[in-house]
């Protein structure tokens, strides 16, 4: 295993594992673990260096997910979704959106997540099968 994986595993043993049983039993989000992930810089792992991030890629992302999931599947999955959301913002977001969201990730340790599902298509969040009808007073969504 790589040095990065070993460091992520050490982090997980110290900051995720102590909360794992409780968050699973209470069906809760791993708040304390995520606070520590932010402080340690994991939220900005895949943010390009020119935007203030660590500029790492999929290898480091997958190693962090694997290490975190070894202590808690919940923490590993939630962390993975943060980076999925972040990669979509970086690839498809407007410059205005990128500047706002990425700045919050880098400077304020914000993490991202989806609250999304589309009937019959799973979570194809960047190419939704939905139609918007704009009227004078409202937007009607169908799909």
What positions do the PLM features span?
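Alpha-helical interface subdomain recognition
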Residues: 1-66
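Short alpha-helical functional segments enriched in proximate histidine and acidic residues
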Residues: 15, 19, 88, 112
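Short alpha-helical linear motifs
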Residues: 31, 84-87, 125-127
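Internal helix-loop-helix
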Residues: 39, 43-99, 103-108
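Glycine-rich, Trp-frequent "lid" loop and neighboring beta-strands that shape
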Residues: 54, 97-143
């Amino acid at each position: 295993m790589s040095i990065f994986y070993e460091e992520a595993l050490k982090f997980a043993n110290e900051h995720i594992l102590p909360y794992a049983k409780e968050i699973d039993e209470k069906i809760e989000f791993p708040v304390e673990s995520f606070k520590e992930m932010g402080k340690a810089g994991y939220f900005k792992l895949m943010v390009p260096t020119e935007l203030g991030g660590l500029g790492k890629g999929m290898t480091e992302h997958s190693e962090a997910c694997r290490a975190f999931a070894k202590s808690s599947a919940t923490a590993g999955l939630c962390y993975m979704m943060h980076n999925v959301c972040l990669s979509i913002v970086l690839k498809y977001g407007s410059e205005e959106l990128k500047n706002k969201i990425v700045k919050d990730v880098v400077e304020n340790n914000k993490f991202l997540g989806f609250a999304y599902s589309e009937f019959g298509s799973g979570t194809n969040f960047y190419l939704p099968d939905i139609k918007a009808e704009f009227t004078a007073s409202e937007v009607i969504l169908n799909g």
